[in-house]
Amino acid sequence: MNKLFRSLAFYMLILVISVAIAVQLGGTSQQTTQLVYSDLVRYIQQGEVRSITLSGAYAEGELVSGEKFTVQLPPSSSQAPLVEMLQQHPNIKLDFRQDNTSGIWAMLLQTLVPVVLVLLAFFFIMQQTQGSGNRVMQFGKSRARLVTDDRKRVTFDDVAGIDEVKEELAEIVDFLKHPKRYLELGARIPKGVLLYGPPGTGKTLLAKAVAGEAGVPFFSISGSDFVEMFVGVGASRVRDLFEQAKKNSPCIVFIDEIDAVGRQRGAGYGGGHDEREQTLNQLLVEMDGFSANEGIIIIAATNRPDVLDPALLRPGRFDRQIVIDRPDLKGRLAIFQVHAKGKPLEPDVDLEVLAKRTPGFTGADIANLMNEAALLAARRRKKKISMQDVEDAIDRVLAGGPEKKSRVISEKEKRVTAYHEAGHAVVGHMLPHMDPLHKITIIPRGRAMGYTLFLPVEDRYNISKSEILDRMTMALGGRAAEEITFGEITSGAQDDIERTTQWARRMVTEWGMSEKLGPLTYGMKQDEVFLARDMTRLRNYSEEVAGLIDEEVRKFVHMAYQRAIDILTEHRDALEKVSEVLLEKETLEGKELQDLLEQLLPPRPKPEPLKPRMVGGGTSQVAPAF
């Protein structure tokens, strides 16, 4: 910092002095006229000279017009005629000065200052470009960051909820620690490991944990850091990355979002992207070029493995592909325990209950949830995080944004919202395959005027036809309540209708749940151009079948809507009572909500158990919903 300050001060001083000299010389040159000797003689004879000072080989003076002048005189031996001429004109003030070289210096400075300024400017520019030149030379270098700080080392203890994945990667760690054990047996450790799964499931954290457990250098780079607008830069960076890795082997090279550079070649508009494909080609060569005993392991992460080039996924490059999915109940509990460390919790905080309340949450979601709970507790001036803080944080994450209690809502809209949400609650309570009702509120949050929250009690990986129809019926319960109560419908059911239509179409075209169309898939999945797949594909069904698909979708939606109408018509009193209580309290949840529904409605019907039935003379276990 001091060196930079001294350099700036030096250049500023030079600049100020140069400007001052230039201004002075510029001012003098603007007021003084350079005359030749013959002009001076003529002006003297014409009486146009007011004063003159002789100083050796130079003379300076002033004309009658006020204009100042300088003139170079002949040698001293030839100046006698000039002196005699001046003495003959007594009106001219004559003066003599000792010979000095001020005129010479003035002319010299006037000539040299611009040159000096140009040289200084050139020197300054060269110094600046010297650093820039280094940056230019670094342009083709890898941007990988070497992580070696032991204080921030991540281990497998920091990763929870994905024990099976950690077991897969433990082999990589053991190889990095004891490579001879594998090499003596002729074993070849996987050169590359591809981690793929939904965002937030811990792919990057796992890669850091592998490096932390093995205690080796960890290079981290994003796939987008390779490709630039200049041709050849990406390939150069790939080469430099592997050169650095070889110097620090054994080590781990982690490429995050590898789909940015590893996308399938020759796809999209124009046949692909030349620079990206060159970079990918170089990456393929480097991954297949180094031998197993060099101790370099590539770990890559992506949430779009389907768009990667097949050559990148073949054995010898990414030998091992590991799916990292959303954690189950046991995994979520372990993740909650990790993120609860270091946070003061009230005794009422039950992590197991929270794990049950958050199905589908990833590790990143849970980390964000606990952070939101801590922020809410701090905002409420608490010393510890309570269960209510975490519950409010869950609602904030699920519903989007804080409660908007300050929003001014008319009584009419508030009443419509109350009946809409009560319709969801009553219909959902009377459906056998619906999840338990957890909360209902008419306080706006995010873009919603209110919401009804059903929470599953277990993780599900398949869903039956009966469950889908129950969800569709519950979703349309709000619209049905509006029509039954007010005889008028609103736009508040827009999201409900979109979800219901989407479910119905997938039942017909993807899941084969239509009796009329049978167990067939209709229509090819269309991938966008930027996903490096074909831009579009023709549908694989006729116009007649398209009409049948629309008819079946309409049938499923109308069936669900009529079912919701029937339930609310039968339990109209319960709809009215729940709406009144909701208008009074605005939010109902937990035991209070369950007690109210059990008081107003009969017990929820239990789903029919799956029973074997005879199919074609044999016995097979078939779900009635399918």
Swiss-Prot record:
Biological role stated in the UniProt entry: Acts as a processive, ATP-dependent zinc metallopeptidase for both cytoplasmic and membrane proteins. Plays a role in the quality control of integral membrane proteins.
Protein name: ATP-dependent zinc metalloprotease FtsH 3
EC number(s) on file: 3.4.24.-
Compartments where located: Cell membrane
GO cellular component: plasma membrane
Residue ranges, Extracellular side: 29-103
Membership in a protein family: In the central section; belongs to the AAA ATPase family.
Species in which this protein is naturally found: Symbiobacterium thermophilum (strain DSM 24528 / JCM 14929 / IAM 14863 / T)
Residue ranges crossing the lipid bilayer per the database entry: 8-28, 104-124
